[in-house]
Amino acid sequence: KVAENFNLLAALAPWRVDLGVGKAPGGLPASTAALAAGRPAFADFDQQLRDLEGYLSDAQADAQARPIPQTSPERFLLGASPQSARQAAELGWRFVYAAHFDGDPKHIEAAFEAYRTVSAHAPLLATVAFAAPTSEAAARHIGALRVYKLHLGPGQTVNLPSPEAAAEYARQVGVTDFRVEETRPSVLSGDAQHVRSELDALHRRFGVGEFILDA
């Protein structure tokens, strides 16, 4: 269904349609289950990506996603790990690092290194930026922003917007032994010139090809 929809859009508007994929839709587990419509909660994401690429590239022998556009939509995978970066590279997709979830420079570098070992494309970086007339004004606007990291077990963390949402998430997945950590989100902030200089610095340090900004 996804391949057919994007092929149709690409046929109607060549060179103007991109397809972006993430591992989770966001929200609480009940919402995710409703969107899954009865499918297994933890399907093989890597195989799903390969199947989607097969339909988009018309490489599936037993099924085809019609129409077949003159120009196929460009594909992007959003992730925050070397595993996601390798998945994108092996499929020939562009990789977008989700720095708005994890802006740790060491993690960005590890993911980009994994991507570049396979792909010649420049990676993208998604982050949050806020510009105001002065740095002081920007600081006032974003000062109260918080992200609540829910720790469910070894290697299992989820970012939520409030302690209440974190507790509700744990309840819906049936976990009673959890921990909630209050953190500040990674935000590029200041006046316009400062935000621009921060983006330039990220570009030089990591070789970012494009930025996706949540503003």
Show the residue positions of the predicted features.
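An alpha-helical appendage that flanks or caps ligand/catalytic pockets
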Residues: 39-65, 106-206
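Acidic (Asp/Glu)-rich catalytic clusters
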Residues: 6-17, 87-90, 112-120, 200-207
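A local structural motif
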Residues: 68-74
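Short aromatic-enriched loop/helix-cap "lid" or pocket-rim segments at secondary-structure transitions
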Residues: 30-34, 89, 136
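Hydrophobic faces of well-ordered beta-strands that scaffold small-molecule active sites
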Residues: 17-21, 74-78, 93-98, 121-128, ...
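Flexible, glycine-rich active-site loops centered on histidine and acidic residues
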Residues: 2-59, 101-103
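Glycine-rich beta-alpha junction loops
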Residues: 23-26, 79-82, 100-105, 127-134
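A conserved active-site cap/scaffold subdomain adjacent to cofactor or substrate pockets
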Residues: 83-101
